[in-house]
């Protein structure tokens, strides 16, 4: 799997304009929609239990994000996820803050038990808590811990029968057999709320057009990281507000050629 092959997935997303159904959180809804539009995907945010199953059935991908967790949204996620499974629509799950509270952890473990996932994406602490491994977490954005990230990712992929994506200073993608580390990105992403949540939805757009989910995730993470690097280079003296605007620009403007030039991946 070379960089040229990976970079072509970006062009495929833009040519296909996939519909990505998001059941996401109130903090990031606008940013997620704008990010997907900038990339070239078509976002829809449908939450009502009366329509989520139908909407999920016609989407290219379904993204479930439990950032601002409420019981009615959990019900909607389960309805949408089961419909997606029946209709062969890939489901991505972002277990935001798993481990922070008992309710949040319970939901984070219940959803993968009920729904077949194409991708689970979170920081190391979140993924560890989904599979009931001890890992310290403080708040929904915490990711620091003392475990082995690659080991946790492989364990999650095996136990949940999915592709596990753990993001941090470096990003890990694995299906339990193939394991790749992506080394693109920029620390200023942590200063803008919703960049992780948007990333999961961007992976959804890539998964909608590339059925090798490992390849799709690698392509999405590399694209996202390169776009962040290019945006940071243009706004380094200005701060996170300017970065956020420029990042949306780079989601629209970063090309497959940029990915070939700047992408950094390592197979381990």
UniProtKB/Swiss-Prot annotation:
Its cofactor is Mg(2+). Keywords: ATP-binding, Kinase, Magnesium, Metal-binding, Nucleotide-binding, Thiamine biosynthesis, Transferase. Pathway: Cofactor biosynthesis; thiamine diphosphate biosynthesis; 4-methyl-5-(2-phosphoethyl)-thiazole from 5-(2-hydroxyethyl)-4-methylthiazole: step 1/1. Pfam families: HK. The keyword Magnesium applies. Substrate binds at residues 45, 194. ATP binds at residues 121, 167. One of its GO terms (biological process) is thiamine diphosphate biosynthetic process. CDD domains: THZ_kinase. Its EC number is 2.7.1.50. InterPro entries: Hyethyz_kinase, Ribokinase-like. Belongs to the Thz kinase family. This is Hydroxyethylthiazole kinase. It comes from Bacillus cereus (strain ATCC 10987 / NRS 248).
């Amino acid at each position: 799997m070379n960089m040229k092959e990976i970079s072509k997935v970006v062009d495929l997303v833009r040519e296909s304009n996939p519909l990505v159904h998001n059941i996401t959180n109130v903090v990031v809804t606008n940013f997620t929609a704008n990010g997907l539009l900038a990339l070239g995907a078509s976002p829809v945010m449908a939450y009502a239990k009366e329509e989520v199953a139908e909407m999920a059935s016609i989407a290219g991908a379904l993204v479930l994000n439990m950032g601002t967790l409420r019981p009615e949204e959990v019900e909607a996620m389960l309805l949408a996820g089961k419909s997606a499974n029946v209709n062969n629509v890939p489901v991505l799950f972002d277990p935001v803050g798993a481990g922070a509270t008992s309710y949040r952890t319970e939901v984070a473990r219940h959803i993968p038990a009920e729904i077949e996932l194409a991708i689970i994406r979170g920081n190391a602490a979140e993924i560890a808590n989904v599979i009931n491994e001890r890992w310290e977490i403080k708040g929904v954005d915490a990711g620091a811990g003392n475990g082995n990230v690659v080991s946790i990712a492989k364990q999650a992929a095996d136990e949940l029968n999915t592709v596990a994506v753990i993001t941090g200073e470096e990003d890990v993608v694995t299906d339990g057999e193939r394991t790749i580390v992506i080394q693109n990105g920029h620390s200023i992403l942590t200063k803008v709320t919703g960049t992780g949540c948007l990333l999961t939805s961007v992976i959804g757009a890539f998964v909608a057009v590339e059925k090798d989910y490992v390849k799709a995730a690698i392509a999405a993470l590399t694209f996202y990281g390169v776009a962040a690097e290019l945006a940071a280079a243009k706004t380094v003296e200005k701060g996170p507000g300017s970065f956020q605007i420029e990042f949306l620009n780079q989601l629209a403007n970063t090309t497959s050629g940029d990915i070939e030039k700047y992408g950094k991946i390592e197979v381990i």
